[in-house]
Structure formats: C-alpha cells, structure tokens
Amino acid sequence: SSAASDVYKRQVYTMPATGGEPLRITYTATNSRDDLGDRMGPNNIVMTWTPDGQRIVYRNRISDGFSGKLFTVDKEGGLSEVIPLPEGGFCSYSPDGKQLAYNRVMREFRTWKYYKGGMADDIWVYNPGNKTVENVTNNVAQDIFPMWIGDEIFFLSDRDRIMNIFAYNTKTKQTVKVTNFTEYDV
C-alpha cells in the first residue's frame, strides 16, 4: 500500500447512517508500531461514544507504540482531549456519564487462552469527579470488554477457563456469571 493510504487507514472517521461521505475526525500521527494490530489492536481504535452522543472515545498508541492512552474527540472533529489515565483499553461509561469502566492493559486482541500473568486485565472504574480508580474485578484471569448497563458492568472473563459473560453489580459489589458455556468461549 502507498504511504498516503497508510496515513488514512489509521484515523477515526464518522459516516452518516444514511450513507454518504465519511468525515475524518482525527489527525493523529502514526508510528512504526502500527503493525502490531494483531497483538494490540489497531492504533486509533474507537472504544465507545460518550453517553450524550457528542464525543468519540478512541485509544491511541503514539507515545511508545505499546501503551494505549484514551482520548475523546468531538463527533464533528477538532482537538482531541486525553482522559487522564496512565493507559486504557476498551471502556464503557456509566449511564449518567460520571464514571468510566475500562481495562488498563490492552490485551484484548491476544490469542493466549487462560492467561494469568501480570498483564492480565481487570475492570477498573474511573471517577473523574473525585479522581479515583477502583479495581472492581480483581481476578487473576482476563476480565475484558466492559459494558455498563444500568447498575451492572458486564464483561468477558475466562476465570473458569472458558470465556463467559459475567456481571458486576455496582450497588452490591458482587459479580455473577451470566452465561455458562463449557466447551467453547462465548
């Protein structure tokens, strides 16, 4: 591929639901580590939208190619704003938009099964109002892809050796298994 096309394929775009021309939202630099997409996910990957639908959250790995930082950018474009966390992966806002459930380490694209090492992901909750983070899963297995719905944060985990859906209740602080696949990952 040409150098020009490489620049464009690692940016964030929006497209009208009815079709039409895509609108380029980000103008971030790329780096020589962009080839790590299979291991770390693509650079500038969209993680979610803010609950008000006005901003896009994406992860950028430009600092060193390995550590992903979360940014937001207006859906019409403009300057990106960093979410003040050391690093971040997939994430989901609380329904009121006041907290963010996220993975600190970006390992969601790794193919290792039942990894329990020091880089295993947990689900953390960031509260920008009081500038705190809390590990809500604190499990040695992979806990990834948080999705905050109501009072629960749903996520995937292989804590029982097979990847299933679990839910953490933010009121009771209890985690329950939602699916029970026993042969293949959900």
PLM features per residue range, with description:
Residues K9-Y13, G65-F71, R110-Y114, M119-I123, ...:
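Structural motif
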Residues S1-Y8:
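Short, small-residue-biased leader/transition segments that mark boundaries at the very start
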Residues S5, L36, Y58-G65, Y102-M119:
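Short, conserved, GDST-rich strand-edge loop motifs in beta-rich repeat architectures
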